[in-house]
Curated annotation (Swiss-Prot):
It comes from Sphingopyxis alaskensis (strain DSM 13593 / LMG 18877 / RB2256). Binds to the 23S rRNA. One of its GO terms (cellular component) is ribonucleoprotein complex. Keywords: Ribonucleoprotein, Ribosomal protein, RNA-binding, rRNA-binding. This is Large ribosomal subunit protein bL9. One of its GO terms (biological process) is translation. Residues 172-210 are annotated as: Disordered. Residues 199-210 have a biased composition (Acidic residues). One of its GO terms (molecular function) is rRNA binding. The keyword Nucleotide-binding does not apply. Belongs to the bacterial ribosomal protein bL9 family. It comes from the Bacteria.
Amino acid sequence: MEIILLERIEKLGGIGDVVTVKNGFARNYLLPNNKALRANEANRKLFEANRAKIEADNAERRSEAEGRAKDIDGKQIVLIRQASNTGQLYGSVSVRDIVDALAEDGVTGVTKSMVELERPIKSLGLVDVKVKLHPEVVVTVGVNVARSPDEAEMQSQGIDVIAAMFEEEQAEAAAAALEPDSEEEFEAATPPSELAAEASDEDADDAKEA
């Protein structure tokens, strides 16, 4: 289907461009969201008659978005979730979760359609998510998914929590392996000369008691 764009659409074009798109994309997204018009003769004339106003309105919305971008770009939100020791979440973080977290942090006016998340987040860590405030104004928000505020703080400092935990477990296991677990292991680790000396001392003590 041939359409006239009413705003900039990534990979398609800018205001006033006439482009061809798949019928489903036009009918299900572009046309109902007032992002384009069918490129028939009547709509071409209508667009040209209103081009100045359309461009002025777009410039106003872009300016407003640029003002908001200063307060949002680079912001980091923290989402506390339960996860396994391998870092896999028991569930996932969705676009709705991100929008709600931004709202709780005082960022209003961000809708689900503005958040560009290819797939739900299913593991701990930091993820950069793009938020399209306007077709020409895109900001980045850091999503910090952790099991606790302390872990979130560590991740914000660039520490890989899962790797750090794994290293700690390895160190504990190595330390435990060096400690004798029984008297037999202790004796096995004790030089024969020391064991003989201990035995002599015990014999001497027994003789005194006798």
